[in-house]
Amino acid sequence: MTYSLQMPRFSISQITTFAAPFADDVRAYAAAGADGIGIWEIKLREGGDGEALEQLQASGLESAAAVPAVPSILPLPLMEGPPEPAARIDAICASLHRLAPFRPSGVVCLTGPGSDRDTVVDGLRTIADEAAGIGLEVGLEPINRVGGEDWTMISSIPEAVELLDDVGRPALGIQFDTWHLWNTPTVLEDVERHVDRFVGVHVADWREPTRNWADRVLPGDGVADLPAILAALDRAGWNGLYDLEIFSDNGAFGNAWPDSLWDLDPDELARRGRDAFERVWAARIQRDVDRVSPGAL
């Protein structure tokens, strides 16, 4: 088994500090020692893209996977956007051009729920072609099978690969997410087999029992075997950013959890997130050795 001896590059997705404005996110993440930021288009105020880009460049942060304002081809619950797939595809393509100056590692895209695969395939081709024309990649994100019927038609890496192969566009890859895929029976094997198709990695842990999709916890605070997943990514050669993505509803999506991480100060949450990731990263070697040779270390 071969492992990186250095800390990987760590970033924080802006949804993690949901209520903070763009400038506060950049400052808090840089102060916490993060290497990058995952930009959400909803954090860019109208007419403020130039200022946001200057703030990003001055911070020295890299740009991880970005999330467009309309993130899926088919409509999603609780998220705004037109109901017609064609209009949603146009919106995603427009977002690609808006996000391109920030040079994200990829732009996240979901299928949306339902069974209209032909519309999704055609839409992904259009989106991938638009991305390729401006030097971007698109990351198709599988969504957790627990409650995923409201969000997606793919819930595993093999299902994503099959859809990618149907689309047949080199600018389309996979956005891996530990929260969504930790309970896939073959996740470790899937990571090692298909890591070369990943354009981004989201990291969060699974609360048990979980209360809904916006109830994620920091790495190490849940039941997902994150050390094993990070070890698999490390062995497979993933060298991109590990992007912390926390949804923790404080009432914004209808549930005001009393222990919502979104209620924390952005600086505190960024520091805690960084520390939590580093602890889980350090645990990956012990966990992987125990998996193949219990008690060897």
Q: What annotation goes with each model-predicted range?
A:
Residues 16-22, 39-51, 73-76, 113-119, ...:
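Acidic-and-aromatic substrate-binding clefts and catalytic sites of carbohydrate-active enzymes
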Residues 35-36, 62, 105, 137, ...:
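Residue-level detector of anion-binding/catalytic polar loops
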